[in-house]
UniProtKB/Swiss-Prot annotation:
Reactions accelerated catalytically: (S)-2,3,4,5-tetrahydrodipicolinate + NAD(+) + H2O = (2S,4S)-4-hydroxy-2,3,4,5-tetrahydrodipicolinate + NADH + H(+); (S)-2,3,4,5-tetrahydrodipicolinate + NADP(+) + H2O = (2S,4S)-4-hydroxy-2,3,4,5-tetrahydrodipicolinate + NADPH + H(+)
HAMAP family from the UniProt entry: DapB
Residue positions of the active site: 147 (proton donor/acceptor), 151 (proton donor)
Record function comment: Catalyzes the conversion of 4-hydroxy-tetrahydrodipicolinate (HTPA) to tetrahydrodipicolinate.
Residues given in the record as NAD(+) binding sites: 8-13, 89-91, 115-118
EC number: 1.17.1.8
Source domain of life: Archaea
Compartments in which it is found: Cytoplasm
Gene Ontology terms: cellular component: cytoplasm
Protein's recorded name: 4-hydroxy-tetrahydrodipicolinate reductase
UniProt pathway: Amino-acid biosynthesis; L-lysine biosynthesis via DAP pathway; (S)-tetrahydrodipicolinate from L-aspartate: step 4/4
């Protein structure tokens, strides 16, 4: 039985993940963490300042974090010191926060899966984008992403991963965020961010030449697609050797 604590228990993702785990035969939800205390699918939820003592009490195997960057930067080191495997889906981390998280995972000698998107489809799309970028390196490239009005980080973590892939394959290129006025295109990557309504997540990469346009895209219709991926990663990371993994490891993608 895999015992799980969810940080961000009352959030959109935390609630969906909690519901899924509560129905799994090989998993047990033992607690949650959020900015207010309460109960969550019949288990206690504590505030992050009590996390260390709480983990010592409930002894989870895996801690899942879908919070906000400042909270994750505090939660993950505490979980690593407690010897818990980690699933991190929080986006918007600064380089300094990510370095601190990575160091804590290594010092704690625990396994962790870190991804900006737990959708199986998006992880496959990332591999396709990398392959396309290698073969279409002289094409103009644009990245477009859209999310709900409440999303705090822009561009999204998923879009940042796309940009990282593109820079690795065809960079370095300047990233231009939106355009205004008379602007002649140079060697760059255009980035366009849309926020509105309750858009779950749309991402597209356009490769354009004078003769054709190739567009690779992914649309999530329900947040459950991310939650299911996170639960899959939870099952995978349990018992793994210490180290920092990605969803490509979970899905055995090259």
């Amino acid at each position: 039985m895999i015992k799980v604590v969810i940080c961000g228990a009352f959030g959109r993702m935390g609630t969906i993940i909690g519901e899924i785990i509560s129905k799994e035969q090989d998993m047990q939800l033992v607690g949650g963490v959020d900015i207010k205390e309460g109960t969550f699918f019949g288990v206690p939820v504590v505030t992050s300042d009590k996390l260390a003592d709480f983990l010592s009490s409930v002894q989870p195997d895996v801690v899942i974090d879908f919070t906000v960057a400042p909270a994750a930067a505090q939660n993950v080191p505490v979980a690593a010191r407690a010897g818990c495997a980690i699933i991190l889906g929080t986006t918007g981390l600064t380089q300094e926060q990510r370095k601190g998280i990575d160091a804590a995972i290594r010092e704690g000698k625990v396994p962790a899966v870190i991804s900006t998107n737990y959708s199986i489809g998006m992880n496959i799309l990332w591999t396709l984008i990398r392959d396309a970028a290698r073969k279409l390196s002289d094409y103009d490239v644009e990245v477009i992403e859209a999310h709900h009005r409440y999303k705090k980080d822009a561009p999204s973590g998923t879009a940042r991963t796309i940009l990282q892939i593109l820079q690795e394959e065809i960079g370095p290129r300047e990233e231009i965020y939106g355009r205004e006025g008379m602007t002649e295109r140079s060697s760059e990557i255009g980035v366009h961010v849309i926020r509105g309504g309750d858009i779950v997540g749309d991402h597209a990469v356009m490769f354009a030449s004078n003769f054709e346009t190739v567009t690779l895209s992914h649309r999530a219709y329900d947040r459950s697609v991310f939650a299911e991926g996170a639960v899959r990663a939870t099952r995978w990371v349990f018992g793994k050797e210490p180290g920092i993994y990605g969803m490509k490891d979970v899905l055995n993608l090259s």
